[in-house]
Design a protein with these regions (language model features):
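Intrinsically disordered, low-complexity regions enriched in small/polar residues
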Residues: 10-11, 38, 86, 118, ...
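Generic alpha-helix signal with a bias toward terminal, lower-confidence helices
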Residues: 59-61, 114, 124-128, 143-146, ...
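Long, acidic, intrinsically disordered low-complexity segments
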Residues: 22-34, 119-152
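A short, conserved, highly charged catalytic patch centered on acidic carboxylates
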Residues: 1-98, 102-121
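Non-catalytic nucleic-acid substrate-recognition regions in nucleic-acid-modifying enzymes
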Residues: 138-203
């Protein structure tokens, strides 16, 4: 978290609304807190950490439905993280939470698994190596691409370039009546012109 410039708080956080929403995993009615809480952009971040990798998660089925009984929520990282995230969703005005189940003590074998939680449900996401994608500068992009499944900015730009290149190629062939050996020269001239600060199609 420190390496990703995400300011975090052990167990409680400065936002009183979130603190009041925390409910014990043991169902005692008392307060309970995850290992860490943080804010990144519009997202609340919840982190539950377990020393043993085998305590990462307990699923109901192959669809990665997390068991939410007291035993599972108490023992397993992902289950516990989801418990606290749901408490925030249900009891505060914050409606976008990313809960992390983490396990392991060896940096080479540590498991970090994000879960996106909203009022409509939750989505267990692919494992990540660190928290860089969840910094204030990157988290919106992660949400758009990984949670929502939208295309990346680079892919959209590449498709736009390829579409325009095809259109230009067709125009040079159909209207410019240029052969294959002549078209690269025209394209090169256009690119050189575009690099000039004073270039304008109106001149």
């Amino acid at each position: 978290l420190d390496a990703s410039n995400i300011k975090h708080y052990a167990e409680s956080c400065p936002i009183e609304e979130i603190n009041k929403a925390m409910v014990s995993k043991r169902g005692t009615g008392k307060k309970g807190f995850p290992e860490y809480l943080a804010m990144s952009g519009d997202f609340v971040i919840v982190i539950e950490d377990k020393a043993k990798i085998e305590d990462q998660a307990k699923y109901l089925n192959d669809n990665e439905t997390l068991l939410m009984d007291t035993s599972s929520v108490t023992k397993y990282a992902e289950n516990g993280a989801l418990h606290y995230a749901l408490s925030i969703i249900q009891n505060t005005n914050f409606k976008k939470v990313i809960a992390f189940g983490c396990s392991g003590t060896d940096e080479k074998r540590i498991v970090i698994r994000p879960i996106y939680v909203s009022p409509t449900g939750y989505k267990v996401l692919p494992k990540v190596k660190d928290f860089n994608q969840f910094s204030a500068n990157n988290i919106d992009r992660y949400y758009n691409e990984v949670v929502c499944g939208n295309e990346s900015i680079e892919r959209v730009e590449l498709k736009t370039i390829l579409d325009r290149a095809k259109s230009l190629n067709d125009d040079l062939r159909n209207y410019g009546q240029l052969g294959d050996s002549e078209k690269p020269l025209v394209v090169s001239a256009i690119l050189l012109a575009l690099e000039e600060k004073d270039f304008s199609t109106e001149n």
